[in-house]
Amino acid sequence: MDCEWEGRPQRAGSRASQDPEGLPEARDDGLSESFLLLQMDVEYDPQEKRRPANSAAWSSKNVQRKQRHWERIVSSKKSKRKQERERRKIKRAEDLGNGTCPQHSKRFLKALTKEKLLEAKHSGPRLCVDLSMTQHMSKKELSRLAGQIRRLYGSNKKASRPFWIYLTGFSTDSPLYEECLRMNDGFSAYVLDVTEEDCFSLFPLETLVYLTPDSEHPLEDIDLSTVYIIGGLVDESIQKKVTFQKAQEYSVKTARLPIQEHMIRCQNEKNFHSEILAINQVFDILSAYLETRDWPEALKKGVSPGKGYILQNSVE
């Protein structure tokens, strides 16, 4: 009886160690759990219904799907660009109809400025910057002169009636040229003439007028047949009559800006009065006069209060 009772639990235990389908339980064998998982994968793969039997074909369809998506994006961008072009076209037409100035691209404005400057070469007034006196200038003075050249050119580009500019006595291997390249962005593309030739040999002497503050003759008008010369000289030691003596050496006519005729000295803390101007300031006065034909108005733009002069009519 005792033996029979002990045997029955063993048979029951044997039955309990099997699942309904007769598979061994995981605790009986270490591989049984892996077998169950493998069986589940074999019985059901969620990708199986979507993936073609041929994996290469499935990959090809995936590439085609991405290609179609990319083509839709490209087509959408093209459509938006076309709509934007149409919008700008309508806007330009409306601006012209309303008499307002249309907005132009930077490239268009740059080309327009270049064309205007080139026209001045054939029909505009001529201005020569004499750069033959830079050999004794310090690095600081050369830097200041390079900055003045940049500002002069910038003013000429904006002028309604630009001058044609000559930079004479200007060697491309000189320290000043290197300083201009360093300080002035796009200097090599400036629309002007650069030459090593001296201004006195480049033009007939009778067509030249050297602008110098030491001249006895005030400049009365700007003549298109005359070449006006500005001395490209920055001298912190203030050597007097350098440009005047150079003009006399070549028997060239001289003139000064009519500061004395239209301005008077004013009291200042340092009791300082000077008619010596930077080359870009001289140019601004000439350019303003060419546009307005009004010396007081032109002088007001170029002669700063620090020079110790004010317009006569401002006192009256």
UniProtKB/Swiss-Prot annotation:
EC number(s)? 2.1.1.221
List the GO biological process terms.
Answer: protein insertion into mitochondrial inner membrane; tRNA N1-guanine methylation
Q: Is Methyltransferase one of the keywords?
A: yes
Q: Where is the composition biased (Basic residues)?
A: 63-82
| Coiled-coil intervals, chain numbering | 75-96
Keywords associated with the record: Coiled coil, Methyltransferase, S-adenosyl-L-methionine, Transferase
- Kindly list the GO molecular function terms attached to this UniProt entry: tRNA (guanosine(9)-N1)-methyltransferase activity; tRNA binding
Stretches the record annotates as Disordered: 1-30, 42-98
SAM-dependent MTase TRM10-type domain segment(s): 113-310
User: Which stretches are tagged as biased composition: Basic and acidic residues?
Assistant: 83-95
Per UniProt, the enzyme's principal EC class comes to: transferase
Q: Name one Pfam family in it.
A: tRNA_m1G_MT
Its GO CC terms?
cytosol; mitochondrial inner membrane; nucleoplasm; nucleus; TIM22 mitochondrial import inner membrane insertion complex
Question: What reaction gets catalysed by this protein?
Answer: guanosine(9) in tRNA + S-adenosyl-L-methionine = N(1)-methylguanosine(9) in tRNA + S-adenosyl-L-homocysteine + H(+)
* Free-text function comment from the UniProt entry: S-adenosyl-L-methionine-dependent guanine N(1)-methyltransferase that catalyzes the formation of N(1)-methylguanine at position 9 (m1G9) in tRNAs. Probably not able to catalyze formation of N(1)-methyladenine at position 9 (m1A9) in tRNAs.
Q: Which family does it belong to?
A: Belongs to the class IV-like SAM-binding methyltransferase superfamily. TRM10 family.
What is this protein identified as? tRNA methyltransferase 10 homolog B
Recorded source organism is Rattus norvegicus
Q: Which gene encodes it?
A: Trmt10b
